[in-house]
């Protein structure tokens, strides 16, 4: 059968179209891969920083043998967990046991979609950005509860119940604080919230307009991260390791990863909501406005924004690590009383006060 020239050109055009689709697909996932690489590096840095700061507080020597200054210690630990045997409980629910860590990790990773790390550097600038984060972060305790229930272990089950109770108790004050910030910024978009703080530089940050909300958000974030003094779901002296008791290998490593990812997400949201995000501390005259805008200047401005955002986030990280080695663990009744009887009324009063001021200013 003879194929004429028109049919050959048509076939070639379709093949080129398929090639373009493949190239476009690769380009579209490039930002996601870049973000995942950045998150991985950040987690490794946070683990190293925590060990070094903890060693300094306790006046001892931190990791020093795995690489220069112990920088490769986290990679060595992750590699060890990757190759350890994955032990499954004989009388547990194997499917839920395997799904639990995955739900926890995925829910935390999705939170990075709406975090603006720099100017024009956000995966999804949604109109409901902060509410999407709250909705996604409330899924993680379901994974922890599934992990505790499926282990068929009383310590694991108690740890899962504690994680769920703790998350519910502190999610509500956290939401009220976010609502107050949204009222001040007239938007739920994380990018709009940052830009609303850029007008007056350092004095335009929401931490000065919402000092009570900032303290409540700070405490609630630490509780959501299950850090000392709020690490009751995995209290070693009481519950062995809580919902992680029956886990080993890569599944245990996923829970370890979730802990530091939660800490990183909370640090970035404190920066975005209260510390001006990528904005510099001087009043709003951008250094880059003196130059003609081109690609090089745009990339440099974005890089500076990322650097400023991460610098502010590391301040929260330092505070959380210091608190870990300063305050003792709370009892479960004290933790619930703090959430329901103290933080909830204060955050609700702060929201009502903010609403009143916004109505008066109209």
Swiss-Prot record:
Reactions it catalyzes: a plastoquinone + NADH + (n+1) H(+)(in) = a plastoquinol + NAD(+) + n H(+)(out); a plastoquinone + NADPH + (n+1) H(+)(in) = a plastoquinol + NADP(+) + n H(+)(out)
Keywords assigned by UniProt, alphabetized: Chloroplast, Membrane, NAD, NADP, Plastid, Plastoquinone, Quinone, Thylakoid, Translocase, Transmembrane, Transmembrane helix
Entries under InterPro entries matching the protein: NADH_UbQ_OxRdtase_su1/FPO, NADH_UbQ_OxRdtase_su1_CS
Enzyme Commission (EC) number: 7.1.1.-
Subcellular location: Plastid, Chloroplast thylakoid membrane
GO-annotated cellular components: chloroplast thylakoid membrane
Membrane association type: Multi-pass membrane protein
Principal subcellular localisation of the protein: plastid
GO molecular function: NADH dehydrogenase activity; oxidoreductase activity, acting on NAD(P)H, quinone or similar compound as acceptor; quinone binding
Membrane-spanning segments: 29-49, 103-123, 128-148, 164-184, 202-222, 247-267, 303-323, 342-362
One Pfam family here: NADHdh
Biological processes, Gene Ontology terms: aerobic respiration; photosynthesis, light reaction
PANTHER family, sorted: NADH DEHYDROGENASE SUBUNIT 1 (PTHR11432), NADH-UBIQUINONE OXIDOREDUCTASE CHAIN 1 (PTHR11432:SF3)
Oligomeric and partner information: NDH is composed of at least 16 different subunits, 5 of which are encoded in the nucleus.
NCBIfam families given in the database record: PRK06076.1-2
Record's function text: NDH shuttles electrons from NAD(P)H:plastoquinone, via FMN and iron-sulfur (Fe-S) centers, to quinones in the photosynthetic chain and possibly in a chloroplast respiratory chain. The immediate electron acceptor for the enzyme in this species is believed to be plastoquinone. Couples the redox reaction to proton translocation, and thus conserves the redox energy in a proton gradient.
Membership in a protein family: Belongs to the complex I subunit 1 family.
Name of the protein this chain belongs to: NAD(P)H-quinone oxidoreductase subunit 1, chloroplastic
């Amino acid at each position: 059968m003879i194929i004429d020239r028109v049919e050959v050109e048509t076939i070639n055009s379709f093949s080129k179209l398929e090639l373009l689709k493949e190239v476009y697909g690769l380009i579209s996932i490039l930002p996601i891969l870049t973000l995942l690489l950045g998150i991985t590096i950040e987690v490794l840095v946070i683990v190293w920083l925590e060990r070094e700061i903890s060693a300094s507080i306790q006046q001892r020597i931190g990791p020093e043998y795995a690489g220069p200054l112990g920088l490769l210690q986290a990679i060595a630990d992750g590699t060890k967990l990757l190759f350890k045997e994955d032990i499954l409980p004989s009388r547990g629910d194997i499917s839920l046991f395997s799904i639990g860590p995955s739900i926890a990790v995925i829910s935390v990773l999705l939170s990075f979609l709406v975090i603006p790390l720099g100017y024009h550097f956000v995966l999804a600038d949604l109109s409901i950005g902060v509410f999407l984060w709250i909705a996604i972060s409330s899924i993680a305790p379901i994974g922890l509860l599934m992990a505790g229930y499926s282990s068929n272990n009383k310590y694991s089950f108690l740890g899962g119940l504690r994680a769920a109770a703790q998350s519910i108790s502190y999610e509500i004050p956290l939401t009220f604080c976010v609502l107050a910030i949204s009222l001040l910024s007239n938007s739920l978009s994380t990018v709009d919230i940052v830009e609303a703080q850029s007008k007056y530089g350092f004095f335009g940050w929401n931490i000065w307009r919402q000092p009570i909300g900032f303290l409540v958000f700070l405490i609630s974030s630490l509780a959501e991260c299950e850090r000392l003094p709020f690490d009751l779901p995995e209290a070693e002296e009481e519950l062995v390791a809580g919902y992680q008791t029956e886990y080993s290998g890569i599944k245990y490593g996923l829970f370890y990863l979730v802990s530091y990812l939660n800490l990183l997400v909370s640090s970035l949201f404190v920066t975005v909501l209260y510390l001006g995000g990528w904005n510099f501390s001087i009043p709003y005259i951008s250094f880059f406005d003196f130059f003609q805008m081109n690609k090089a200047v745009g990339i440099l401005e974005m890089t500076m924004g990322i650097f400023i955002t991460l610098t502010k986030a590391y301040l929260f990280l330092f505070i959380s690590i210091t608190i870990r080695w300063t305050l003792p663990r709370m009892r479960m009744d004290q933790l619930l009383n703090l959430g329901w009887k103290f933080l909830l009324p204060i955050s609700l009063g702060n929201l009502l006060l903010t609403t009143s001021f916004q109505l008066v200013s109209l």
